[in-house]
A protein has these predicted regions:
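UBC/E2-like fold recognition across ubiquitin and ubiquitin-like conjugation systems
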Residues: 1-130, 209-216
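Basic nucleic-acid-binding interfaces
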Residues: 116-138, 143-171, 214-216
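Generic preference for flexible, low-structure residues
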Residues: 17-22, 163, 174-176
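Long, compositionally biased interface segments
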Residues: 169, 173-216
């Protein structure tokens, strides 16, 4: 198990779409490639206020969002790449994700200007265009393979909310988990009391004992 704590934020905006998720993944990848993180071997000692990557049987990003020094939200999503912290190698299916490949993926995202094309064909065409424009045609296949994964992997989105403003009894509890981000699939699980990043990690950790829901 490795805990990689980032000293800089990896999410500049709320996560409301797959495009937002991809941006977070690519920003975290940037920091991993450039070694802009600290390694923590004891989760009890990790800074609750900083985003971190938990790497073990599961690989998940945990991203707290603070207002006036108080954590009001904690986002967690699956991290789809493999990272060897000892060798400083970021990869996907034996494809080495280096600065040039990650930069190409960021360029593709920026070209979309906030909206993904409707078809996979248009997306992949843009991947090839970016590689050709940057004299990186030799990385076309790698870019397409990694970007296809980003477009299709199971995001595993969970968000903890401390939401006093919209509190409405049991319909919208002050403390709750939002599962999934789209309006069609999201739902809430109410919490009796607030939790921190470590508690959310424990709830989602597949190597720890399960947590149980208790009906009212």
């Amino acid at each position: 198990m490795k805990l990689l704590s980032f000293t800089r934020n990896i999410a500049s905006n709320a996560i409301r779409s797959r495009l937002d998720v991809i941006k977070v993944i690519l920003q975290a990848s940037d920091y991993l490639i450039d070694k802009q993180y600290s390694v923590c071997h004891n989760i009890e000692k990790i800074d609750n206020n900083q985003p971190f990557l938990y790497v073990d049987k599961m690989s998940r990003l945990f991203i707290p969002e603070k207002t006036a020094g108080e954590i009001l939200k904690i986002y967690s999503i699956v991290f789809p790449f493999s990272y060897n912290a000892d060798q400083h190698v970021l990869s996907f299916n034996q494809i080495n994700i280096n600065n040039s490949l990650n930069s190409c993926m960021k360029t593709v995202i920026n070209v979309f200007d906030g909206v993904l094309p409707e078809t996979m064909e248009k997306i992949l065409d843009r991947c090839w265009d970016v590689c050709n424009d940057n004299d990186l045609s030799y990385q076309q296949d790698d870019l397409v393979a990694v970007f296809t994964e980003l477009l299709t992997f199971d995001i595993g989105y969970v968000r903890y909310d401390y939401d006093k403003e919209h509190q409405n009894g049991d319909m919208h509890p002050t403390y709750h988990l939002d599962i999934n981000y789209s309006n069609q699939s999201t739902y809430k699980i109410g919490l009796i009391q607030p939790i921190d990043t470590l508690r959310l990690e424990a709830i989602l950790d597949t190597k720890q004992e399960c947590w149980f829901l208790k009906a009212n």
